[in-house]
A protein has these predicted regions:
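Short amphipathic alpha-helical segments, especially helix-boundary/capping motifs
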Residues: 2-6, 27-32, 53, 87-94, ...
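Catalytic adenosine-cofactor/nucleotide-binding cores of aminoacyl-tRNA synthetases and other
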Residues: 109, 121-125, 132-249
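Residue-level detector of secondary-structure boundary/capping sites
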Residues: 17, 45-48, 105, 157-161, ...
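Poly-acidic low-complexity segments
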Residues: 14, 18-19, 45, 68, ...
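A local structural micro-motif
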Residues: 7, 38, 126-127, 178
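N-terminal Rossmann-like or analogous alpha/beta NTP/dinucleotide-binding catalytic cores
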Residues: 1-61, 109-121
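Active-site cores that bind ATP or allylic diphosphates and position pyrophosphate for catalysis
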Residues: 8, 55-155
């Protein structure tokens, strides 16, 4: 929608929770869903850059390199040479000229820290505009947040569903079109249509509960469309197979 560059960053600096097969799985899932990135990099490949900037803006201590934040200090580079989350994330954004970021509402507190680090980076590397950050609501199953740490946030749980149906299903969780009748007019969208219509200003920061029954309903109708060789519009308008209001309530 912004005609921008899609950057896939692999956060692999936590060595205890980093396995090659997990990274391969990310690439595979992105490809399966047709989410083609323009640039990809791993944070573990940028350790020299993190150290370079940490030495410029931080102070060497027993804990590594720390940044003076006034009332407290923040470790930005550990003694093992690996950066902390907020430091490497915002330095990546700076180096790659990132303009727009979408994160979960659980990262709101991090934005304050990243602003402070960004200002320090700009002092030694040159001024740049801080990215526009939009916070989206989290996905819950029951009363538990979907989380890879808890093992309930993997796409493997949804492998039998149509990828096209899943993308439409996920889009409806936290994004809405300003036209209140849009969903009934366009209950199914292609990836290209999603990109053209998407506006981060219409993202909701409310948490959403997953209802697999609604996904199953959409998946059934989508597969019926594929068997018939129909377009989404033909299924909705002519066959009346899919009524968005049946699964959007």
């Amino acid at each position: 929608a912004n005609n921008g560059t899609f950057i896939l960053r692999i956060d692999d600096t936590d060595q205890e929770r980093n396995k090659p097969e997990w990274i391969d799985y990310i690439y595979e899932q992105m490809a399966d869903f047709g989410l083609d990135h323009d640039i990809t990099f791993r944070q573990s490949e940028r350790l020299d850059r993190y150290k370079e900037v940490a030495e410029k803006i931080g102070t060497k201590t027993d804990n590594g390199y720390e940044l003076d934040m006034g009332e407290y200090s923040m470790v930005i580079l550990r003694n093992n040479g690996f950066p902390t989350y907020n430091f490497c994330s915002i330095l990546d954004d700076y180096d790659y000229d990132v303009t727009n970021i979408i994160r979960g509402v659980d990262h709101i507190a991090n934005e304050v820290k990243q602003h402070l680090i960004w200002d320090k980076i700009c002092e030694v590397e040159g001024d740049k505009t801080f990215p526009v950050i939009t916070h989206a609501g989290l996905l819950f199953e029951g009363n538990a947040k979907l989380s890879k740490r808890k093992g309930n946030g993997t796409t493997e749980d949804y492998k039998d569903f149509s990828k096209a149906a899943m993308l439409n299903w996920l889009l409806k969780f936290g994004w809405s079109h300003p036209d209140p009748l849009f969903d009934k007019k366009h209950p199914t969208l292609s990836i290209d249509e999603m990109i053209a219509l998407f506006n981060e200003g219409n993202i909701s920061d409310r948490n959403c509960k997953i209802d697999k029954a609604k996904l199953a309903f959409l998946d059934k109708k989508w597969k019926a469309m594929e068997r018939r060789g129909n377009t989404a519009k033909e299924v909705v308008v002519e066959s009346k197979l899919l009524k968005f209001d049946e699964f959007s309530k």
